[in-house]
Amino acid sequence: MNNNSKRKTRPTGGGASGGISRYNSNDNSLRPTNNKAGAGGGNGGAAVRPSAQGVYNNTFFMHSATALVGSVVEVRLRSGNIYEGVFRTFSGNFDIALELPACIKSKNLPEEGKVPKHIIFPADTVVTIVAKDFDSQYATAGAFQTDGAISDKCNGARPDEKELEPWDSGANGDIDIELDSAANGWDPNEMFRKNENTFGVTSTFDDSLASYTVPLDKGDSLEFKEAEAKAEKLAAEIENNPTCRDRLDLENGDEEALFAAVERPSTEQDQRGDRGDRERNDRDREREERDRDRDRDRGNKPRGAGDFQLRETMSSDRYITKQTRSITGPQLSHVGMSSQGSGRDRDTRGDGSMMMQSGGGSGQGGSTQSTAALMLAGGLKGVGPAPSANASADSSSKYSGGSMVKRKTVPQGGKVMRNNVPTGGSNVSVSQGGNGNSVGQNKGGYQPSMGMPSQYSYQGNSQIMHGSSQYRNQSHMGGANKLNGDSNANTNKPLPQRQMRQYQGSQSNSSLNYGGEPQSLGKPVHGSHGGHPGQNSNSPPLQTAGPQQQQQQQQQQQQQQQQQQPPQQQQHQNIQPQGQNTQPARQVRTRDNQMQELRQFGQDFQLAPSNTSPPQQQQQQQQQQQQHQVQQQQQRALQQSASPPQQQQQQQQQQQHVVLHQVPQTHLHQAALSQPHYVPQQQPQQAPLPQQQHVPHHMQQKAQQQQLVETQHQHVQKQHQSQPQVQQPPPQLLQDPSQQPLPIYHTMPPPQTSPVVVTSPVLLEQPPPQPMPVVQQQQTQQLATPKPEVSPAPPSSNTTTPTGIASTPTAGVIASAGSEKTTPAAPTPTSNSATVPTGTAATAGGATGTTPVVKKHVLNPSAKPFTPRGPSTPNPSRPHTPQTPVPMTNIYTTTGGHVPPAANQPIYVMQPQHPFPPQTHPQAGQPPRLRRSNYPPMAASQMHVSASAATGQPLITAGPIPQFIQYGHAPHQQQFQSHTYAPMQMRVYPDQPQQLQFMTQTPQSTTPSPGQPHQQFHPPPQPSPAGGGPQPAFTPPTQAATYQLMCVHPQSLLANHYFPPPTPQHPQQNQQQYQIVMQQHQPQ
């Protein structure tokens, strides 16, 4: 009743009491506000927005009311009737409109039957409004989640996946997809008819498309049937091919399943994961296989000689790097230097070939060598792997893997690395000299300074290797030697000289010839040619003769397998390139010529067996330079036709190498050279003589290369006889140069007849070590310095000066090649018949061919201990083992492997005659020099020690390498001219010649202390009295030639206690010597 009374009193009552009360209060409140708003509007103006009327002005009420719109509601009226309908809307007074209202409870039955569409109930008649089945959360919570809710309900929410069915075109009825019928509603033929009839256009369309294709002439002829049968047969074969079948299956199979099918995400992910796992597993397996192969290759590399070339290309970098590490890090520095050289080589040479060769060289040399080999470039590959370099590089790679290879290569290859670049052109010095060499070489005077520093760093690396010393000599030859050559060339005609080197690039030997540089001093052309083909014959072929060098390289590698004979063959090969190169050498240098000079220079550096005492070399160089000057004119006339003669001589030398007698002149000269190197291991002084001999010989080579092709052999013998210490080898060298004797020098490297070579004066002075000369000789040949070590024993090897060594090497090379360890017995013959070898160059070739066995056996006793070393340091052991002639001969075997270095070293000796004598002084009694000859087997330091101890000779091959490694640039300086020759850079410029010289001295040092190569290198000052005594005589002449180019550095080199007298004479050579010494020490 209370409620009713209240409703009656309220005109607007009709809803629920609560709603009405709110409505009333709101309405009342609205009215005053409206009034106020109106008054304010009247007073303030019409800007005031009119407010909503009635309930529309109540925001909260409107929110609740509108939420009910569209819902089914029951409206109770004051009359007691209840209507149910859809709440449609309401007015400002809250008059309610219902759709399809139905009277649930009515007093008037007749009305109940009527259902109007809309009924509006005034607000005052409504008592309550109740909404049924109303979701109070729908409007607020579910709206923005509609999509997500639908997705959750429909997509992927089903626990069971619907089975997928493939699409079947027949399911929807056959679909005609043919174009022939009027599927699209019109007939193409009708179109043609209409165009023809209406427009007069006739179509040439033919269903057979005969105008677009070539119809087959299917006749009944027999030919057509045969062709058809043949075609069907071929088609059947192709279709039956498993590969073809797989493709057809892929094309004709269920492409939808492969490319267009819908796959469950989980299944696809699983498959992808499985595929990823399989792929990862496959990659892991492949990586493991590659690693195993690499390890297997590394393991085989030290032992493989025949596959050395392949391995060097395939895995030389990997293996060599590893081996380089084993070598104790000098190789690494060597590599760094080498890479510098290679970079400079690129800059100076701008020749892809040099870099390519460098790469090849690195392959052989090893990873370190690869950089170094880059500098060697062609030198190591073409020349570096020359009998010495090849034997050394190959053997080293065989024995010590990369490390040994690096060292051995360094003697030939290492030097070659530098020399190669200089050989290609003066610029090649860069690769040799490292940074500045190529630049320095490009500029005659500047080259020395640049060459020295670059070589300094390079020397440091080279020193690390036994061959490093030799390498340094080569580097000096490339830079300093080039400088020496430039000294000669610069003094005389630096550019021509480089040209000479370019063409003599294969005769880069001039660099190898330490004496060769002095010769270059005497005659720039000859000096550049002075990279004695004979001496450099180990590596030179690589530089100048790109193809020939490669061929020679291959031959060298093959010969390396043959070890000692191969060096000779390589020498012959090298001689050929040099002969070819020698001719152009005289021509004005072009960029190509410079590049060739660089390559040749690298080769010459390889040849730089500076074993002959530098003084002897200088003397011989001076003598030979004079001769060469006379001969150069002849050669210049002959050089045009020089390559044929040189090639002939090369062939002869090769024949000598094979026959040893065919080219006894050239080959024996090489043998003599190689013997001096070889003997120098036995006798430090002897090695220097060969170097001097080589240097003059190199000059002679340039002057007389072609004339001397025949005459030089005699001349060499004569020189050897006249210049027992150095000159006889120089004639040989000259012959080699004229004949392109680099190969000859390679022939020398197999100094199987090395003992015969002992005839050089230095060798005479140092007869005692001769028993080991064969092995050492090869080593010394590879390592110019080791030869001088033999010097102490040369008294018996007096007979043949470095020339004697060279002459014996022909036989010696073969003998060595045949039996590298034969040297022990051969040394005595060498010293005794050393003189004979020079004269007996031919006989030495043939006789030593037979002799090597005896010498080999003599050396074998001591060498065998080295063979055991193979495991620890494969390269060193092999060089010492006489019975591992082929691989070890070139790389490890002091006899065979080092013989090629000896050949190279004699050339070195020639140029750095002054440096070598000083080296000889420090190394006079030290086998470390010989070890330097062994530097190719860088890891064979222990082997060198044991081999030298057992053999009684300096272990050139094994010892020198470690010595050089251990010795930093500074130690090498000490050994060479003075340990205080701190400025490696200075040495670097005269580096190449001096390195060659140093190589000779290093063998001398090695000879005194065969047991320990490192000690041997350090003792070089001690042997200086013993080996220095003989060498000083040669020192003045050689230094005079050497220092010309390296005036500044030479003095410091001269300042060294090793070569005080040489300094004034040939500062360049002394510098070179210092460089060589540094290299030697580093290798230690």
Swiss-Prot record:
Bilayer-spanning residue ranges: none
MF annotations from Gene Ontology: mRNA binding; RNA binding
Gene Ontology CC: cytoplasm; cytoplasmic stress granule; ribonucleoprotein granule
Composition bias, Basic and acidic residues: 265-300
Extent of Low complexity compositional bias: 384-403, 424-445, 540-584, 613-694, 701-711, 733-743, 754-765, 773-788, 796-812, 822-853, 1000-1017, 1066-1084
Tagged with keyword Cytoplasm: yes
Biased segments, Polar residues type: 22-33, 312-331, 452-476, 484-513, 886-896
Biased composition range(s): Basic residues: 1-10
Bias-annotated ranges (Pro residues): 871-885
GO biological process: chaeta development; circadian regulation of translation; compound eye development; compound eye photoreceptor development; habituation; locomotor rhythm; long-term memory; miRNA-mediated post-transcriptional gene silencing
Modification sites for Phosphoserine: 208, 211, 221, 266
Keywords: Cytoplasm, Developmental protein, Phosphoprotein
Superkingdom as given in the UniProt entry: Eukaryota
Phenotype seen when the gene is deleted: Second instar larvae lethal.
Disulfide bridges in this chain: none
Region described as Disordered: spans on this chain: 1-46, 260-935, 1000-1037, 1057-1084
Pfam family, one: LsmAD
Cellular localisation: Cytoplasm
Segments forming domain Sm: 60-135
The record's note on its domains: The PAM2 motif, and therefore interaction with pAbp, is essential for binding to the 5' cap of pre-mRNAs.
Protein role: RNA binding protein that regulates various processes including circadian behaviors, actin filament formation, eye development and oocyte formation. Forms a complex with tyf and pAbp which functions in adult circadian pacemaker neurons to sustain circadian rhythms likely by switching between activator and repressor modes of post-transcriptional regulation via interaction with Lsm12a or me31B. Forms an activator complex (Atx2-tyf activator complex) via association with Lsm12a and activates the TYF-dependent translation of per to maintain 24 hour periodicity in circadian locomotor behaviors.
PANTHER family per UniProt: ATAXIN 2-RELATED, ATAXIN-2 HOMOLOG
Protein family according to the UniProt entry: Belongs to the ataxin-2 family.
Quaternary structure and partners: Homodimer. In the circadian pacemaker neurons, core component of the Atx2-tyf activator complex composed of at least Atx2, tyf, pAbp, Lsm12a. In the circadian pacemaker neurons, also a core component of the Atx2-Not1 repressor complex composed of at least Atx2, tyf, pAbp, me31B. Interacts (via PAM2 motif) with pAbp. Interacts (via N-terminus) with tyf independently of pAbp. Forms a subcomplex composed of Atx2 and pAbP which can associate with the 5' cap of pre-mRNAs independently of tyf, Lsm12a or me31B. Interacts with Lsm12a and me31B.
Protein name according to UniProt: Ataxin-2 homolog
Naturally occurring in which organism (per UniProt): Drosophila melanogaster
